[in-house]
Amino acid sequence: MQNISRDKRVQAIIIGYMFAAFIEGAAGFGTPAALAAPLLLALGFPAMAAAIICLVFNSFPVSFGAVGTPIVMGLSPLKPILDAGVADGGMTYAAFCKIVGEYCTMMHIPMAFILPVFMLGFMTRFYGPNRTWSEGFSAWKYCIFAGVCFSVPYFIVAWTLGPELPSLIGGLIGLGILIYGTKRGFCVPETTWDFGPHEKWDASWTGSIAASGKTEFHPHMTQFRAWLPYAIIGLILVLTRIPELGLKAWLASFKLSFVDILGYQGVSASIDYLFLPGTIPFTLVAILTIGLHSMKANDVKDAWTTTFAKMKAPTIALFAAVALVSIFRGSGVNDAGMDSMPLALAKTLAALTGEAWPALASYVGGLGAFITGSNTVSDLLFSQFQWDMATQLKFSKEIIVAAQAVGGGMGNMICIHNVVAVCAVVGLSGSEGMIIKKTFWPFLLYGIIVGIIACGLVF
């Protein structure tokens, strides 16, 4: 990284914005900020600045994170409703998800340009030696360049291939173009900016892990070998998500079915176990990487042990959320003829907010992410509620549900689970409240912009 640029503003964009966007597209669930923040710390960033930058930037890629999981899986409570309408000429669940993804890009993309400029100004104002906004704002050309690098493939993929690959492809292509342009000085600020001497930093900026002062790094493998697993993941995902190639239908044909669950007729479920991203490509590439990186047995053991340890919390949360969603959906089946919980909430809020709801819908998604720790779980909990709100108010269901998905993405920056994880990896455990106080303002700004766009689309 030091060979590309020593300007901390540039490093924040490359690592905190672009690299984290790619990791979000591939893995999600809090991984990007937890990976990117220690990298910034190693480059000499104050721990507090590294944590806040990575949390805030991990927002617009999130709706398409983990190969589209927040939309493809998160909106699954709507699948029975949509499937029931297909016979009458209604759209399929897959078509609905694609349209929701398209609207998500329209709400997210403005922030892919606004947020970098704002955050660099924030960084130089609160963590710079001169305490000015202008030093960060002066890198606006580079921020616009980064926004174009990410947003163009992000938008194209969402509108052509669907909601699974926009962040992954946008981050991968954007990262390559951004690094290439940076090395050649394209839109790079003329002066190099830094945080100043460590001894002048405020004590609250640092934690138990000291920021690195190293300027040299000696790699233990080539760039090609380091990036090869990510490239293979991206290639396999693209090849298996294009229907015309036939791989998508073939992989989806392998199903694990559960019929008449617990003895109840008609209560069935199935899993396309080979089409799941966790199987192909992630598990497949994880096994291939052992050979590609010539990993030793102990390294392989440590990697898998760490992976399963990190999976515990999100797995438990997802199991609990799916069960809770089933209760929400089933609450409408009762002898008293009462509405389901989501529908009852929707009717009450529709009466209170009226036509102002599109301006507020994203904050519900953000609240869900704040509480549950995930955009996916937020969508699982509130997608049917948003659907019912749109039905009550006669708004486009796709737009209102998209605002929910976008809200879950922007909620990542205040999400308790993510904040705790980032604080742990940069040595700031105990400072979570201070960080949320800082990230709340970008969250509020994000929601205002999304609300304006949603209102424009609806009206």
Region spans (language model):
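Re-entrant/interfacial helical elements at transmembrane boundaries that shape
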Residues: 31-40, 55, 68-80, 376-389, ...
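Hydrophobic alpha-helical transmembrane segments of multi-pass integral membrane proteins
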Residues: 6-38, 42, 56-59, 315-332, ...
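Alpha-helical transmembrane segments of multi-pass membrane proteins
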Residues: 9-21, 47-61, 87-116, 317-320, ...
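Membrane-interface interhelical connector segments
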Residues: 70-101, 333-355, 381-385, 392-393
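Transmembrane alpha-helical segments in integral membrane proteins
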Residues: 113-127, 279-300, 367-374, 417, ...
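Juxtamembrane and boundary regions of transmembrane helices in multi-pass small-molecule transporters
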Residues: 63-198, 406-459
